[in-house]
């Protein structure tokens, strides 16, 4: 069950886009509250997502005036979703299962301060998914989400379906599982 009005609207969508994912992370996961509760990190090595949290970033041109612009800016600020090299966010672009897993991975790296989470599963042999080689750019994120019970492959086929869409209900279930993983109660 969604915890917010925005989550309720997204729950009924057949597929979610980058703007919807921004709203889910900001409203349902309460990313700002989560980040405020984390202890300050000392200097040293930072992942690309962590570097984004300390830099001042401008709002992407295609997010300005978008209905979800404040939520988009929030997930960009924390490095959960990124702006493309062209400076655009593409808020209406559909999110795939692989992209969702990548966003979850970035959050887990920032929340746990465990940089090894970004590379822990690359090169596994054999691949844990029948449809994804362990050399796939998002393999590590998919394996991390699967290992932690946040996202699962198909029980019958073993396929993760990285290019498949995520509907609103599944997106919210993933967020609830992620909240439980982080032991969050908001």
Residue locations for each model-derived region?
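N-terminal propeptides
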Residues: 1-186
């Amino acid at each position: 069950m969604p915890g917010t009005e925005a989550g309720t609207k997204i729950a009924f969508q057949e597929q979610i886009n980058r703007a919807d994912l921004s709203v889910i992370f900001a409203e349902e996961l309460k990313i700002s509250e989560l980040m405020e509760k984390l202890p300050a990190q000392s200097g040293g090595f930072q992942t690309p997502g962590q570097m984004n949290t300390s830099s001042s970033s401008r709002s992407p041109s295609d997010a300005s005036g978008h209905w979800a612009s404040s939520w988009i800016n929030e997930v960009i600020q924390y490095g959960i979703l990124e702006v493309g090299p062209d400076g655009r966010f593409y808020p209406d672009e559909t999110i795939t299962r692989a992209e969702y897993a990548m966003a979850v991975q970035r959050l887990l790296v920032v929340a746990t301060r465990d940089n090894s989470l970004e590379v822990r599963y690359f090169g596994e042999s054999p691949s844990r998914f029948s449809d994804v080689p362990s050399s796939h750019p998002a393999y590590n994120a998919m394996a991390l989400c699967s290992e932690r019970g946040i996202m699962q492959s198909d029980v019958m086929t073993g396929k993760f379906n990285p290019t498949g869409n995520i509907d609103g209900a599944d997106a919210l279930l993933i967020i609830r599982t992620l909240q439980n993983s982080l032991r969050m109660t908001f």
